[in-house]
Design a protein with these regions (language model features):
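Active-site C-terminal subdomain of aminotransferase-like
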Residues: 1-74, 78-80
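A common structural junction motif
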Residues: 19-21, 93-100, 127-130
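Conserved PLP cofactor-binding pocket of PLP-dependent enzymes
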Residues: 69-70, 74, 96-111
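A C-terminal functional module that forms or caps the active site or interfaces directly
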Residues: 76-93, 100
């Protein structure tokens, strides 16, 4: 149970939704997470390392204002105000790279089981370009 003022409760609701807490099918996601831990634990470490590598490249990019600390396979970042978000996303989409818009200027990239080493190298190369 969480108790707090309006600001805290609104923040908690936003985070819950961001993490999938508003989904009715949350049991399916929990089952997938359990399977991943049982069968792909070592692979999860690779995903986490790749996410950290993506974050490191983003931190060096002039287009990126900030990158949140990476603890899992999720990379969350904000663009500089002079970079049109739609143009940035469209450019990556043209290279078959999908980035989620989280709102409030935050963007999200996620590594996963089907994200290959070749895809990773390609992404890092594209993100490294000015």
């Amino acid at each position: 149970m969480l108790v707090g003022d309006d600001a805290l409760m609104n923040k908690a609701l936003r985070i819950r939704k961001m993490l999938g807490g508003g989904m009715r099918q949350i049991g399916s996601l929990a089952a997938a997470a359990s399977y991943a831990l049982d069968h792909h634990y070592d692979r999860l470490k690779e995903d986490h390392q790749k996410a950290k590598e993506i974050a490191a490249v983003l931190q060096q990019s002039e287009a990126v204002l900030s990158v949140e600390p990476v603890e899992t396979n999720i990379v969350i970042f904000k663009l500089n105000s002079n970079i049109p978000e739609a143009l940035f996303l469209d450019n990556l989409k043209a290279h078959n790279i999908l980035v989620s818009d989280m709102g409030s200027g935050k963007l999200r990239m996620v590594t996963h089981l089907d994200y290959t080493d070749a895809m990773h190298a390609n992404l890092l190369e594209i993100l490294s370009k000015p």
